[in-house]
Amino acid sequence: MFFVDVLWKLVPLYLFGSETKSLSATESILQIVPEAMAATSSNVLCNASESDLCRDDSAAFLLKFVAIASILLAGAAGVTIPLIGRNRRFLQTDGNLFVTAKAFAAGVILATGFVHMLAGGTEALKNPCLPDFPWSKFPFPGFFAMIAALITLFVDFMGTQYYERKQEREASESVEPFGREQSPGIVVPMIGEGTNDGKVFGEEDSGGIHIVGIHAHAAHHRHSHPPGHDSCEGHSKIDIGHAHAHGHGHGHGHGHVHGGLDAVNGARHIVVSQVLELGIVSHSIIIGLSLGVSQSPCTIRPLIAALSFHQFFEGFALGGCISQAQFRNKSATIMACFFALTTPIGIGIGTAVASSFNSHSVGALVTEGILDSLSAGILVYMALVDLIAADFLSTKMRCNFRLQIVSYVMLFLGAGLMSSLAIWA
């Protein structure tokens, strides 16, 4: 085939001459032969399956079982620790230990998106086996990542709106029976003014209620604390999670409510956990397939260590979000199992199709490149917006200098360690 390519290019050259009219026969041959050799080798590479000096099908098959067990245990442990630890004092979601561990996990997810997924998508969509048009004419990896981030923003926004309205409807329905029994001079909790644990508006831990002369239109005059009041001194009061009502003796009082923040935060945590799981699952399937179709033990061994590390801390971040969302035990268990099983299932599917799979085919490269790029956009958005910004810009972080230092160190450490794994996997 190589000689046919050379003759195919030489015959028109001698019949019609070269473009420069100055190339000799020897120069023409020296120019065409390397081009034909490069084209031939490229075609062989793109049409062939994996060819590696380290290829060993039987050893690779055994290593895939080790990978399934290791990654399954790592993912299950990572996602389970926050769910079990929410009933333990040292691992509660509002504790400093959890915040610093979550910062490390956020760094791992951020590095996964930038260094691993986006780089993998770029490598696949810039592969020489793909046709020049359109893949070499436009930066598709960054474009797909941007589209995924914008779609995630839209889903994040719409999901938050949906759950907030749902909680408002439930709150209004729960207080409606009480509204018929109250006198006109007493205000009942309006939408967004409920408190945690089913407490009535103004109820203290002792069980007493101190609603004093609050008119029905007080809901229209609710006060949010000015910036000066949102200080570290009042932070402990907000963390208590109880609402406080302050009445004025002249019967025209105004209520100060912090309970509405809990409903908003609850909706945010629900959406964050669901969108984060969607992003993690989408790239976990690709990772599992990539490992499953490989027949090289030299490739699989470092992937086992890298993916186990990656799955553990990704699972920890996801488990923390699920814990903060306060899902029911059944829903939390389903989400945790879905995360833990995704990559092993991908490895199993990849192993089943490994004999007939060509990783250099156009379809495989385009699919891998697009999904990797989309996953990168989702992970980068979730890491920066819903994990890092949500914690690092919070009052809890701002009011604790030591927590700031430790969290930043853990964030950079997680990102650095996950990035360094790109050397081997």
Swiss-Prot record:
Residues 119-137, 291-301, 355-369 are lumenal. It is a multi-pass membrane protein. InterPro entries: ZIP, Zn/Fe_permease_fun/pln. Residues 86-97, 159-269, 323-333, 391-404 are cytoplasmic. It comes from the Eukaryota. It is found in: Plastid, Chloroplast thylakoid membrane. The keyword Transmembrane helix applies. Keywords: Chloroplast, Ion transport, Iron, Iron transport, Membrane, Plastid, Thylakoid, Transit peptide, Transmembrane, Transmembrane helix, Transport. Pfam families: Zip (PF02535). The chain crosses the membrane at residues 65-85, 98-118, 138-158, 270-290, 302-322, 334-354, 370-390, 405-425. One of its GO terms (biological process) is iron ion transport. Belongs to the ZIP transporter (TC 2.A.5) family. This is Fe(2+) transport protein 3, chloroplastic.
